[in-house]
Amino acid sequence: MKNKINTILVLTLATLMLSGCKSLYGRYERPDVKTTGLVRDVMSDKDTLVVNDTAGFGNIPWRSVFTDPILQGLIHQALDHNTDLLNAALNVKMAEAQLTAAKLSFLPSFNFSSQGTISSWDGGKASKTYSLPVNAAWNVDLFGTLLSSKRAAQVVLLQSKDYQVAVRAKVIAGVANMYYTLLMLDKQMQLVDDMEQLTKDTWEIMKLRKDAAVGVRSVAVQSAEANYYSVLVQKTDIRRQIRETENSLSLLIGQQAQAITRGKMDDQLLPTSFSTGVGLRLLNNRADVHAAEMKLAQCFYNVQTARSRFYPGLNISASGTYTNSGGRGIVNPGSLLWRAVGSLTQPIFQNGRLIAGLKVAKAQYEQAYNSWQNAILTAGSEVSNALVKYNSSLEKSKIEEKKIDVLKKNVEDTKELMASSRTTYLEVITAQSSLLNTELAKVADDFARMQAIVNLYSALGGGAK
């Protein structure tokens, strides 16, 4: 009866250990995640963008999206010299080295240390001894500790590569946005230059009419002069913004701050019809989302490692020593000694360290899962924002174009009326100010549309190719 009970206990323990081994050797599988509704519909009744799940906009090579040769040259320079990208590449090298070490941990380790002594007792003949020991140790991975560590190192390498791709995409989008910012500022500077001349002419005309006593008072001349100075202030601000943007772009492409050669805003050709791709395609394209999932996988294997530490560890060590007995030198060089030891260690009480380690690993897994979920939601939000920004800026630009046509005619009409003294100076100044502000706003909205395209491309994982 006692033997039967012992047999049942042994079988039960063996079954529990085998079931535990199965879970310890398990591979990471992607948890369920909600992908429907990640991208919100655009707010316009008639969609300007073609949103479907065909070939995604983010899969297009960046050279096909940004066709300006000057911009392409700046992007190439950034990819070669940007410090964040260079550091990301070094992170990949470090992860590769760690993975190599994790793979080699399955093999035995060997150590060699030689030792020799010369001794003489009471002035007698010197005695020479030497030993050439080789020690080997092998940690047998019975319960997946080394395997989980290796798999964790593998996903860390993938995470490092994903981070490198994410930085690359961010750099490409950053260069494009700054380049287009410079083009916008150049066009605004051109508009301000034209308005500077117009307001100066208006001021001169009012001075002449005041001197000729043709119905223009000093207050009108002063207002025209102030309007002219306001334009000069705007010009100074734009010049400062150009210099600051050039400095930022120079830093991004890894060079000293200097002037940036560039094209013109009106010559830029960017896509106007897109397929965004949704759901899992969005998850696969976004390098930062995939990196967050690889962090989740790493934490999964860390939990496996923490669990495996509760199980016994098998260590096998061996040593071989070539030695002599001393004094006989080369004639009888010595003998070879062998020794082998195997040990099985079962943790019983480790001051709560094993339980604490498992709890920490599980908590880190939950944190990684939350971060992954947030990365998914952030990706969807960025796509939605880019779509809304594109449609909104396009709609505003069309309205402002009509408004500019009206204001240009208004400026011409007020100039003619002022010549015949049939309007006030205030109407003239107001018409000029309204025209300039609307023209500047239209340029800003045109830039916002270009920026939305860049942001949409980046939000869909563009820049990896």
What function would you assign to each model-found segment?
Residues 2-80, 239-284, 458-465:
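Terminal intrinsically disordered/low-complexity segments used for targeting and assembly
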Residues 22, 155, 162-278, 389, ...:
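Periplasmic alpha-helical coiled-coil/stalk elements that build and connect Gram-negative outer-membrane
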Residues 49-67, 71, 76, 113-135, ...:
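Small/polar, glycine/serine/threonine/aspartate-rich low-complexity segments that form flexible
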Residues 86-104, 113-115, 297:
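Short, acidic/charged, Gly/Pro-enriched secondary-structure junctions
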Residues 86-87, 103-104, 140-171, 219, ...:
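Sec/SRP-type N-terminal targeting helices
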Residues 209-215, 418-422, 459-463:
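A short glycine-centered flexible hinge/capping loop motif at secondary-structure junctions
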Residues 219, 419-444:
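Short terminal targeting/anchoring segments
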